[in-house]
Amino acid sequence: MKDIQEIFKAQSQHQYTLGNSSASQRISRLNALQKAVEKTYRKDLQEALFKDFKKPVIETDLTEIHPVISEIKLIKKQLKSWMLPLRVKTPFVFIGSSSYVIQEPKGVCLIISPWNFPVNLTFGPLASAIAAGNTVIIKPSEMTPHTAAVMAEIVSAVFKPEEVSLFEGDATVAQSLLSLPFNHIFFTGSPTVGKIVMGAAAKHLSSVTLELGGKSPTIVDASANIDQAAKKIAWGKFLNNGQICVAPDYLLIEHSIKEAFIIAFIKHTKHFYSEQVSKSEDYGRIVNQKHFERLLAHLEDAKKNGGTIEMGGDFIASENYISPTLISGLTADATLLKDEIFGPILPLKTFKKIEEVIDYINAGEKPLALYLFSKKPSIIKQVLRNTRAGSTAINHSVVQYSNHHLPFGGSNNSGIGKAHGYYGFQEFSNQRSVVKQFSFSAVEILMPPYTPLKKRLSEWTTKWF
């Protein structure tokens, strides 16, 4: 705790130095981070992620390293323009003055990152925080210790402690950090823990970004290309072993295409991972025994609540392995239809009318993502207008996260605030309003004493301006 307090004090004192840094100085720090992730420590990160939960090297490159590099490149290209004051209109009554908005750093920031994409969801927000001119303390997840250790090396090699520091450890470290008056907290994790983080932040009135989760519905109607829908959903669901906050969480399939969809889904899953999935080098593992047992409990509950296993259902306890699993026929009481799954199990429900789907989705919390496979513009329009979600992909899954020109985040229970690109820069910035008087102020005419003439001028101003 002493080290944490000392670093927090040092960063608090250093925040104005970083806050006044130029775009080129911030870009220099981003270049150093990019080089470390892309080149110097790339192999170390690949090996660490494989040790933590057998993440395939290609998936590490595609879902961990590339997104960070892509984010940094976008920031470097646009940062100078983002930092410029934004001129805005000034009402006529304030003639003789100008108005503008400046982006100032929030100050000392805390990033609490998760285990499912530890590199991506640590260094992505860090890039935004650096771009905005903040000092940062990072608390990575203890569930991926090998990766956390490599990230600690990177932070120590690239930054001074008063600029960026990383503290490894369990929940007690996070609790110690949350007791401090950070200016901003960026948390990625579950809604349950998100509420704890927000409660701690409220004690200091710290602003928060909460990237949470939820049950992301995936709709397929009869007009969709069934084969393509099955392929893209299987890919999005089983990527990272289903441990993705925006993974398809449950399927809503139009009744008439159920059997055709299941056949196509099984075909593509086998193509991705072969007949013997447990031996595939492209299929990862559940992060630890606790989460493995949680998922097995879901499978046991499904059997008691009408579930029919259409595919998979196999597991190897010694490896934290669960095969890609598709389940249909569940009753409303099944936990798979209530809890965010965060694993390679996908429940399937059918519908006859799109209105049923909309009502079902709206009966729950707003999801982090919603996926719709349809060729009908009217259906697409109807679903978009009558549901709420943090993000949506139409005729694809998961890909919306990878576009750094789009804001990424949830809505209410699935999150507060946005990340990526300009939106991430703004999230770590305070939009400071400035009015600059440079000549006579018309407002002086309306200052006390309030004479009859000033009353008429006030009425005239209200009417016309």
Regions found by a protein language model. Name each.
Residues 15, 34-37, 41, 53, ...:
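Structural signal for hydrophobic packing residues in well-ordered secondary-structure cores
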Residues 21-22, 314, 321-465:
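Conserved C-terminal structural/oligomerization subdomain of aldehyde/semialdehyde dehydrogenase
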Residues 13-19, 111, 218-220, 250-255, ...:
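Short, well-ordered beta-strand elements within core beta-sheets of diverse protein domains
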Residues 26, 72, 133, 164, ...:
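Residue-level signal for inorganic ion chemistry
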Residues 4, 23, 42, 226, ...:
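Residues at or immediately preceding the N-termini of alpha-helices
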Residues 1-100:
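N-terminal Rossmann-like NAD(P)+-binding subdomain of aldehyde/semialdehyde dehydrogenases
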Residues 192-331, 394, 455-456, 462-464:
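ALDH superfamily catalytic-core signature
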Residues 92-228, 351:
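Rossmann-like NAD(P) dinucleotide-binding subdomain of oxidoreductase/dehydrogenase enzymes
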